[in-house]
UniProtKB/Swiss-Prot annotation:
Gene3D superfamilies in alphabetical order: 2.160.20.70, 3.30.70.260
Protein name: Probable septum site-determining protein MinC
InterPro entries found in the cross-reference section: CAP/MinC_C, MinC, MinC_C_sf, MinC_N, Septum_form_inhib_MinC_C
Species classification: Bacteria, Pseudomonadati, Pseudomonadota, Gammaproteobacteria, Enterobacterales
Keyword Lyase part of the UniProt annotation: no
Superkingdom classification of source: Bacteria
């Protein structure tokens, strides 16, 4: 008997979730484009889930999808929809509806970031230091610098740095070093349990991290444009 050409299996993936607080497509496009420009190596063409839990009233779902795509992201589904009329409208637009776990909490919106200062490319890079726990739903971004976290990083939290990332605590969230494309950046963890690790756009999900290194002190870097991992001595 010949083998079937396909096989369906269940799996899980770590995806970024875009929480919408406005239904105007152009407003959404501009806001997302700013985010993508901050970390192009990781976000450009990245798959995302759109959470619409806070949107009230009608929206043009096709135009919203086009706005997200125009910003450089790819919509894989819609979450947070509880209104049946809204669900039907989303389905008519050809967008998949995703069910969330019962215990899942919606991340609180981040305050609008202050305008970025002009960076002198010849100035020495500074280091951003976080000495408190990074909670689920939080995102920390170290622009043009290294990021050091001296506490734990919860699952669902995200660390992004244009430079290196150091975590001196339990690392359960996502760590994205070299976000602006610097392939020389590295990630250092004293206790690795990450959902995702990435350097200059090359990434591993949790199930791709070699099991011998989970829970250990490690250093991640790029070799021939591929992630490598070794003990941190």
């Amino acid at each position: 008997m010949s083998q079937s050409p396909i096989e369906l299996k269940g799996s899980s993936f770590t995806l970024s979730v875009v929480h919408l607080y406005n239904s105007e497509p152009e407003v959404i496009r501009q806001a997302l484009q700013e985010k993508v420009e901050q970390a192009p190596a990781f976000l450009k063409n990245a798959p995302v889930v759109i959470n619409v839990a806070t949107l009230n009233g009608d929206a043009n779902w096709k135009e919203l999808q086009q706005a997200v795509t125009a910003a450089g992201l790819r919509v894989v589904g819609i979450s947070g929809c509880r209104d049946e009329r809204q669900k039907r409208a989303i389905a008519r637009a050809g967008l998949p509806l995703l069910n969330e776990g019962k215990g899942q909490k919606m991340a609180t919106p981040e305050p609008a970031p202050a305008p970025a200062p002009v960076v002198d490319p010849n100035a020495p890079a500074k280091t951003r230091i976080i000495s408190t726990p990074v909670r689920s739903g939080q995102q920390i971004y170290a622009r043009n610098s290294d990021l050091i976290v001296t506490s734990s990083v919860s699952a669902g939290a995200e660390l992004i740095a244009d430079g290196n990332i150091h975590v001196y605590g339990m690392m359960r969230g996502r760590a994205l070093a070299g976000a602006s494309g610097d392939t020389q950046c590295q990630i250092f963890c004293t206790h690795l349990g990450a959902e995702l690790v990435s350097i200059a756009g090359q990434y591993w999900l949790s199930d791709q991290i070699p099991s011998d290194f989970v829970g250990q002190a490690v250093r991640l870097s790029l070799l021939d444009n591929a992630l490598t991992i070794q003990p941190l001595n």
